[in-house]
Regions:
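Short conserved beta-strand and strand-loop elements enriched in small hydrophobics
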Residues: 136, 231-236
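A conserved acidic, glycine/proline-rich C-terminal tail/linker
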Residues: 244-260
């Protein structure tokens, strides 16, 4: 299990690619999403995986098709004759004809079958789970429904999404190397579909908080889950950059007290201490 095609896009995937490189597996090709315009100036920016590939001197084997169904993609991967295809937050669905070329292993950021889909990290935090982890899965045509090859579990209590992304990417990188080294001896386990759950792609509007509807614990969960992007904000566009739960009770939307750290605001069934805000 030495010859690898890698598919991934964000920093989560780049850490996995880096460990594969350090472990001296033969990386035949790196597939990642096309460069995208970023910021107000719309500067064309490469994804994290491409940035790492350039740093490692692997830019000659980077491929960025708009779609894996594009002409020549299947033929190119097939011509490489990979032993395995490693997939981590690539951002495109692998079509059947690519899944058939070689075993495809996905590193999904949840303990499957929970949180199949696009936002497992944020969803676990939103649901106030104490545990999450990484599942190495043999890919099929379903949504994160393939057989389980290995998994690792982590206590996520109190973590925001940025912290959890970082820890899970390291965990995923280590699990990838383990799976690559032990692949031939692994006995896959079918997922128990009856216990499965799905999670949606995060949208900017998901960060909206309503003090008359959301409880203090719900606002805190949103703050942790949407840390960085989209963040949490009120209907008039004020963004809450730092906060914690308070133990005071009072009228919703009213300032209940002041402290050296900020001000305490009444919300549905409780209050929050707002430490830092940003105007619209």
């Amino acid at each position: 299990m030495k010859n690898i095609v890698f598919m991934g896009t964000p920093s989560y995937a780049s850490k996995i690619l880096e460990e594969i490189y350090k472990a001296k597996f033969n990386i035949l090709a790196i597939y990642t999403q096309p460069d995208k315009p970023v910021g107000r100036s719309q500067t064309l920016t490469p994804p994290d995986v491409k940035k790492l590939a350039i740093d490692l001197g692997l830019n000659d084997i980077v491929y960025q098709p708009k779609s894996l169904k594009d002409s020549g993609v299947k033929e190119h991967i097939k011509s490489l004759n990979p032993d395995i295809i490693i997939v981590a937050a690539y951002g495109q669905i692998l079509p059947r004809d690519i899944l058939d070329i070689a075993p495809c292993v996905n590193l999904h950021a949840s303990i499957l079958p929970a949180y199949r889909g696009a936002s497992p990290i944020q969803s676990a935090i939103l649901d106030k789970n104490s545990l999450s982890g990484i599942t190495a899965m043999a890919m099929n045509e379903g949504l994160d429904s393939g057989d389980i090859l290995a998994f690792s579990i982590l206590d996520i209590t109190g973590m925001n999404s940025y912290e959890l992304f970082d820890k899970l990417s390291i965990m995923a990188a280590n699990l990838t190397i383990k799976v690559l080294n032990e692949y031939k001896n692994i006995s896959p386990i079918k997922q128990f579909d009856a216990l499965s759950s799905k999670c949606k792609k995060i949208k900017k509007d998901d960060g909206l908080v309503d003090f008359s509807v959301d409880s203090a614990s719900q606002i805190w969960a949103k703050f942790l889950a949407y840390y960085g992007w989209p963040g949490i904000f009120t209907k008039n566009g004020i963004k809450i950059l730092d906060m914690e739960i308070s133990d005071l009770n009072g009228e919703v939307g009213k300032i209940l007290g002041l402290s050296d750290d900020g001000f305490i605001l009444g919300v549905n069934g409780g209050s929050i201490l707002i430490k830092k805000i940003q105007a619209a």
